[in-house]
Amino acid sequence: AMTACGALKPTTCSVQATCYKYRYVYIMPTGSVTGSTGVYTSSVDNRVHGGVTRTTNPSDMMSGILMQKGFTILPQLDQNKLAETLVLSYGETGHRDVGFLWLSTSTGIIIQFRDAQTNDLIASAEAEDSGSTEADSVRYAIQKALEAIFSQPRY
């Protein structure tokens, strides 16, 4: 019997206030995500063969998208700019088997923007995606989450 394709969870988003009233973003540090596909280890020579390996750092990905949207990325929090600064936090929410015969895994992520001065939650989004590697899945999910937040009206 064939197994049906698993569906990705829909992207969810909650926006309390527009992010566009802020000029700066401080991104909490993230580690790199590395993923491989089609890789096998030979029992003969104990070496890794074939496939594609990709690495991404979520902070770098988010920085690029936010700079395109006109934000200035701060290397550290500046006490003189707190009223105009968002703090971005990123986390992974887990992995699920999706796809034909469960040969694919999705990665879920969550992004939160908080006011640097008050710590109030300004916006958050959860997204999930499935790429050819875990690094691709994370990259696609970040794009979906940020798109969901920034597609909200600029009130």
Predicted regions and their residues:
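A structural "domain/chain start" motif
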Residues: 1-69, 154-155
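Surface-exposed short loop/turn segments
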Residues: 46, 63-136, 140-143
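Short, solvent-exposed cationic patches
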Residues: 140-155
